[in-house]
Swiss-Prot record:
PROSITE patterns registered for this protein in UniProt: TUBULIN
CDD domains on file: alpha_tubulin
UniProt superkingdom: Eukaryota
Catalytic activity: GTP + H2O = GDP + phosphate + H(+)
Name this polypeptide is given: Tubulin alpha-1B chain
EC numbers for this chain: 3.6.5.-
Sequence intervals crossing the membrane: none
Active site as annotated: E252
Organism expressing this protein natively: Schizophyllum commune (Split gill fungus)
Molecular function in Gene Ontology: GTP binding; hydrolase activity; metal ion binding; structural constituent of cytoskeleton
Cofactor(s) required, per the database record: Mg(2+)
Length: 446
């Protein structure tokens, strides 16, 4: 067995979780209460990666919902999927983190971490061959940043050898949910840098633009955004759950995408991004999808990939795709001069093909298509996201604005400068990996 446990932290984590589990149930032919639907085709026991089956034939998600305040999780308990989740795997506190990393990490969050680890241990005991853990959280919120970082620290201590992958909502360049987002994001990045093996980032603005421009949603809400994120998460995890001609497991992601431990922030792109009316006019061939994923309009983070160099690239196809077509698409990509790889990693492409076609939520924004592609690329272009964050952090921290709220919650002020230095080092790391080896040799000694 290759079980994966998902932990959804804070409002963003839980709401993305709702969209993901809604999609997983559709993909595995399960009803909202976790039972196999009569007309669903046999899924070859594929769901056991994410679901455990009870003696009564009910499928229960291997997942935890955690939030420091009860509001968002209460909505789940009263929503259409209330019977799907085990009530004990929904853990809430009494007061929220008030957009404050220090509250989520040091004071309010500290009280909740032991019950969370206890529940996680029970989920882990129920697995025969656990592959790893997914942690979903935002960088900007108090619970997502503070408690998310605390959780990853504890996971390193208790489950050191298992793969820990993050799905993070990164602060968008223009859209902001709170003034102190840059502080929270910088602090959580610094804390989790050594504890996370691979972090897939999405930013709300990039997703928002996709919903408006590609999918024709006039006023996208969080449900629209989260359902699109869920498609990306589903594609990344599809080969763990379904058979395929080229399967990719969790450890393979890391091996192929993370050349150095700190450079572990792949950029995700997805194709086709089609609404139902546009679907009739598009061919959606394997080559078309592959080229689309290299365009900035299909990326989940706002940055210009043409400004950077690729270190590694994972192409995860699903549906009606044959390996021969994927290899032909990659061959034509390699002839394009605009797509640059670092000179120390000349081949750079890892292919995955999963036979299960992508599912869509009835009444959702995305059209039903026979095939799709999710591209995960480790590129130096994502350093632009760190530059933006550091700039915003510096503007506030120069005046020590809002710092007293953090220090008042048992945090040392020195942690701010420590985190800032770490991020400066991360920017430098990205700069260095993008430098050609020949240039680096001329500068250094032999």
């Amino acid at each position: 067995m290759r079980e994966v446990i998902s932990v959804h932290v804070g409002q963003a984590g839980v709401q993305i979780g709702n969209a993901c589990w809604e999609l997983y149930t559709l993909e595995h032919g399960l009803s909202p209460d976790g039972r196999l639907m009569d007309d669903s085709p046999s899924k070859h026991d594929s769901g056991s990666t994410f679901f455990s089956e009870t003696g009564q034939g009910k499928h229960v998600p291997r997942r935890l919902y955690v939030d420091l305040e009860p509001g968002v999780i209460d909505d789940v308990k009263n929503g259409p999927y209330r019977s799907l989740f085990h009530p004990e795997t929904m853990i809430t506190g009494k007061e929220d983190a008030a957009n404050n990393y220090a509250r989520g990490h040091y004071t309010v969050g500290k009280e909740l971490i032991d019950p969370v680890m206890d529940k996680l241990r029970r989920l882990a005991d129920n697995c025969s061959g656990r592959q790893g853990l997914f942690v979903f959280h935002s960088f900007g919120g108090g619970t997502g940043s503070g408690f998310g970082a605390l959780l990853l620290e504890r996971l390193s201590t208790d489950y050191g050898k298992k793969a820990k992958l993050e799905f993070c909502v990164y602060p968008a360049p223009q859209l902001s949910s709170s003034v102190v987002e840059p502080y929270n994001s910088l602090l959580t990045t610094h804390t989790t840098l050594e504890h996370s093996d691979c972090s897939f980032m999405v930013d709300n603005e990039a997703i928002y633009d996709i919903c408006k421009k590609n999918l024709g949603v006039a006023q996208p809400g969080f449900t629209n955004l989260n359902r699109l994120i869920a498609q990306v998460v589903s594609s990344i995890t599809a080969s763990l759950r379904f058979d395929g001609s080229l399967n990719v497991d969790l450890n393979e992601f890391q091996t192929n995408l993370v050349p150095f431990p700190r450079i572990h922030f792949p950029l995700a792109s997805y194709a086709p991004l089609l609404s139902a009316p546009r679907r009739q006019h598009e061919q959606n061939s394997v080559e078309e999808m592959t080229f689309s994923c290299f365009e900035s309009g299909n990326q989940m983070v706002k940055c210009d990939a043409k400004d950077g160099k690729y270190m590694a690239c994972c192409l995860l196809y699903r549906g009606d795709v044959v390996p021969k077509d994927t290899q032909a698409a990659v061959a034509s990509i390699k002839t394009k001069r605009t797509i640059q790889f670092v000179d120390w990693c000349p081949t750079g492409f890892k292919l995955g093909v999963c036979n299960e076609a992508p599912a869509t939520v009835p009444g959702g924004d995305l059209a039903k298509v026979p095939r799709s592609l999710c591209m995960l690329s480790n590129t130096t272009a994502i350093a632009a996201a760190w530059n933006r964050l550091d700039y915003k952090f510096d503007l506030m921290y120069r005046k020590r604005a809002f710092v007293h709220w953090y220090v008042g919650e048992a945090m040392e002020e020195g942690e701010f400068s420590e985190a800032r230095e770490d991020l400066a080092a991360l920017e430098k790391d990205y700069e260095e990996v993008g430098t050609d080896s020949a240039d680096a040799e001329e500068e250094g000694e032999y």
